[in-house]
Amino acid sequence: GKNVINSADGNLLDGGRNPYLKSTDWGWQIDPLGLRISLNLIYDRYQIPLFISENGMGAIDQLKNNTVEDDYRIDYLKQHVKAIKQAIEEDYVDCFGYAWWGPIDIISAGTGEMKKRYGFVYVDLDDQGHGTGKRYKKKSFEVYKKIIETNGEI
């Protein structure tokens, strides 16, 4: 038989889907080990300090009682921060910063949707721009705040 490789939908670079990785609601695979490996490869090649300027996951969030219980985002964040710390402390990669993509919910550049939410702050607007525009801290807000305050402690 012929080998079939399924495409990893949504990822910036099209490639084979890893059957062992979980995916977001939009098909982006969640791969903290891949981030660590990438940091090592880039640092090994260029030998300059690295700064991660965009990392995050889009998800469908539900506002309940003026917050979002986004444990899936917290897990993603903790796994990726742990991988970065391992790259720094165990692999000696010089990575001096990490910034989440979209700290507040914004319209997705890739899909034009508001329902694809990245932020730690929920914005009460739908895909058509209807809603109050009010902002609500998600559960992940406090986790990210603590990570910043403690320089990466999780």
Each predicted region: which residue ranges?
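Non-catalytic scaffold segments within catalytic domains of secreted glycoside hydrolases
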Residues: 1-154
